[in-house]
């Protein structure tokens, strides 16, 4: 089984209204960007698993190997609205397709730049989510694939099982579980490949306190541990392949960060 560990810091451009609680209003809306560093060295000397109350997580000495940003976008600027509507119309959705898109998403969350999916690579992977009714739900996956002549083709996949990523508000020791599933069939673009992802999501607010990063210090954060027990499945020229893996994310949320 393959294990992946991710270190994230998520903040908001809105001020928090209560201490040690994070609401849907604190979460990013529309186009928003925060600085992010990819660390390639020195991780083995750091302990990301410390939990509890009034903690101090000091990662000030982490390297800044690759600088970038983690961001969200509006659905209209995601690059996946037109492919979704086109795919919906071809499936017989007609004039209801834009309405359906708007009902499924009001924010696009950039996942990763690229994803190695066995026999091919997915690019610009994005979760089109709906933030409403105190929930953040992943409903559509957007991604791109490079065809045989080097052209980037956008593809969208509506979740067969929508994924409740977060429930709001959350505070110390809150937790939740959900299940998500989505997949794509690439035969329509000349690739004899079917790719499917299924996973169980479990998250818990396992600490609060102060987070120190190479960028700055955050004095009032909630630490969330998210575990995805995931299976990636590919059918390639009628040959099924499967890879189970466990993905662990540690995320610190600061409601008072602009």
Give the residues covered by each predicted segment.
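Exposed boundary/loop context
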Residues: 9-11, 61, 101, 166, ...
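A short, surface-exposed beta-strand/turn
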Residues: 28, 237-258
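Short helix-loop boundary/capping segments
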Residues: 143-240
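Solvent-exposed N-terminal domain segments of exported/luminal and surface proteins
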Residues: 19-137
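Short, solvent-exposed coil/turn segments at beta-strand boundaries
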Residues: 110-146, 169-174, 208, 217, ...
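Bacterial Sec-dependent N-terminal signal peptides
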Residues: 1-24
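Ser/Thr- (and often Asn-) enriched beta-sheet segments in non-cytosolic proteins
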Residues: 21-26, 31-35, 40, 45-47, ...
